[in-house]
C-alpha cells in the first residue's frame, strides 16, 4: 500500500497489515522530491503522483525511483495549477483533476493534451463544470468519476466526454449537508471491485458508497478519534477484495475497513 504523506513530502509504503516497508521522496521541487503529494494511482508497474505544490505529475517506479515528470505550472494545455488526483486508462492516457484551473484534463501517456472538461479558471455548478475538482477515478467500463470538491458532488462522464450523471444534494447544485447522498466537500473517489463508487466526504467525517448510477447504498464513519471515527476522511482506495483504506486527515492515520457481506 502506497500512502501520500503530503505534509512530509514523501510516499510511505506499507503491507496490508500496516507494517512499514519503506519510504521515498522528500519535500522539494527537484526530481525525486515532492511538493504536497496527493491522490496516488498505480498503473503498469508505475506510481503516478500528483503534486499539489509543484503543479506536475511525477511518475515513479515502485522502488521509488523517479522516472519522468508530466506537466508544469500554468493554465495552458497540459499545464496544472495544483493537480489533486490522476487516473490512468488501459491505453496509458491520463485524466487529471486540475484543482485551481477548475477542469479535468485528458492527456496522452507522454503528457500531450487531448481535451478537457470544464472552463479553465472559471468555477461552475452546471453539469460538466467544476468548482475545485479534487480527484478522479476510472471504472472498468470507461466511466470517469470526478469528485467535484467545493461543488459538493460527484460527476460521471462517458469515456468520450459525455456527462452521464451527477449527484450530491438537491439537483447536485452546490448545496452541502449531512444527509445520505449529500456531501460537505468531496476530496477523493475510488471504484470498488463490483463497480460501486466510494467517496470521501471530508467535513461530514465519513465515507459514502454508491451504485455506479449514483444511488446511495451506505455510509460509514463518524466524527472523532476512536476506531471507526474520522477527523476528516481525506482520501481512500479500495482493494480487489473490497477492503477500504481511508486516510484520516487530522488523526494522522490510515484506517482499514472490511467489506460488509
Regions found by a protein language model. Give the residues of each.
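Eukaryotic scaffold repeat domains enriched in small/polar residues
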Residues: 1-261
Amino acid at each position: 500500500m502506497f500512502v501520500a504523506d503530503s505534509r512530509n513530502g514523501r510516499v510511505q509504503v506499507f503491507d496490508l497489515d500496516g507494517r512499514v516497508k519503506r519510504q521515498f521522496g522528500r519535500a522539494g521541487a527537484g526530481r525525486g522530491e515532492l511538493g504536497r503529494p496527493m491522490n496516488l494511482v498505480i498503473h503498469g508497474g508505475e506510481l503516478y503522483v500528483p503534486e499539489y505544490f509543484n503543479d506536475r505529475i511525477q511518475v515513479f517506479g515502485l522502488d521509488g525511483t523517479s522516472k519522468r515528470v508530466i506537466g508544469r505550472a500554468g493554465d495552458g494545455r497540459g499545464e496544472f495549477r495544483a493537480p489533486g488526483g490522476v487516473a490512468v486508462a488501459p491505453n496509458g492516457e491520463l485524466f487529471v483533476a486540475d484543482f485551481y484551473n477548475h477542469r479535468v484534463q485528458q492527456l496522452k501517456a507522454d503528457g500531450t493534451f487531448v481535451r478537457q472538461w470544464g472552463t479553465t479558471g472559471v468555477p461552475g455548478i452546471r453539469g460538466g463544470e467544476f468548482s475545485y475538482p479534487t480527484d478522479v477515478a476510472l471504472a472498468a467500463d470507461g466511466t470517469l468519476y470526478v469528485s467535484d470538491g467545493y461543488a459538493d458532488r460527484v460527476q460521471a462522464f462517458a469515456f468520450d466526454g459525455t456527462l452521464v450523471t451527477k449527484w450530491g444534494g438537491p439537483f447536485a447544485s452546490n448545496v452541502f449537508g449531512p444527509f445520505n447522498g449529500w456531501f460537505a466537500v468531496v476530496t477523493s473517489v475510488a471504484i470498488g471491485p463490483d463497480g460501486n463508487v466510494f467517496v470521501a466526504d471530508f467535513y461530514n467525517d465519513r465515507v459514502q458508497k454508491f451504485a455506479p448510477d449514483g444511488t446511495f447504498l451506505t455510509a460509514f464513519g463518524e466524527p472523532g478519534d476512536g476506531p471507526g471515527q474520522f477527523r476528516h476522511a481525506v482520501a481512500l482506495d479500495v482493494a480487489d477484495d473490497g477492503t477500504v483504506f481511508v486516510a484520516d486527515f487530522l488523526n494522522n492515520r490510515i484506517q482499514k475497513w472490511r467489506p460488509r457481506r
